[in-house]
Amino acid sequence: MKLLIVAVGQRVPDWAQTACNDYAKRLPPELKLELKAVKTEPRAGKTLASLLAAERGRIEAAIPRGAQVVALDERGTRLTTLALAERLRGWQLVGDTVALLVGGPDGLDPALRQAAHERIRLSDLTLPHALVRVLLIEQLYRAWSLHAGHPYHRE
């Protein structure tokens, strides 16, 4: 199974990239992780709707046909770590690729959010985008570790 994170924004601080790489390499070979960063649309006098639509086009171009699409959204379903572990298990049964979408500074285009198979939130807090990437990959690793019986997660 492939976990594809499609994130708006190409600049990530070194500390965040290091953390993402660390958790990604801990995942087993059967859970391939790929991060595709797409360009943030420059504001330059554009409306919010046109900015989000441009980013939506880039995100959609990065999602393979047939992928299960999960949008990270502040209004999405609140999950516990155990619930995310169950979701991960379910995604593994559904198909080859799960695309997890991380919006830019203005979030995701409403049409993209609506078209997603599922919407989840990582936190009730507003988080910096670099931290969202780290947190998401860490939580995916933690979810895998629960089902694998790995001692990483403690109750």
Curated annotation (Swiss-Prot):
InterPro entries: Alpha/beta_knot_MTases (IPR029028), RlmH-like (IPR003742), tRNA_m1G_MTases_N (IPR029026)
UniProt keyword annotations, A-Z: Cytoplasm, Methyltransferase, rRNA processing, S-adenosyl-L-methionine, Transferase
EC number: 2.1.1.177
Chief site of localization: cytoplasm
Binding site for S-adenosyl-L-methionine: L72, G103, L122, S123, D124, L125, T126, L127
Keyword NAD carried by entry: no
Superkingdom of this protein's organism: Bacteria
GO cellular component terms listed in the entry, alphabetical order: cytoplasm
Compartment(s): Cytoplasm
GO molecular function, one term: rRNA (pseudouridine-N3-)-methyltransferase activity
Catalysed reactions, semicolon-separated: pseudouridine(1915) in 23S rRNA + S-adenosyl-L-methionine = N(3)-methylpseudouridine(1915) in 23S rRNA + S-adenosyl-L-homocysteine + H(+)
Pfam assignment, any one: SPOUT_MTase
Function (record text): Specifically methylates the pseudouridine at position 1915 (m3Psi1915) in 23S rRNA.
PANTHER family per the UniProt record, alphabetical: METHYLTRANSFERASE, RIBOSOMAL RNA LARGE SUBUNIT METHYLTRANSFERASE H
Family, per entry: Belongs to the RNA methyltransferase RlmH family.
Subunit comment: Homodimer.
Protein's UniProt name: Ribosomal RNA large subunit methyltransferase H
Name of encoding gene: rlmH
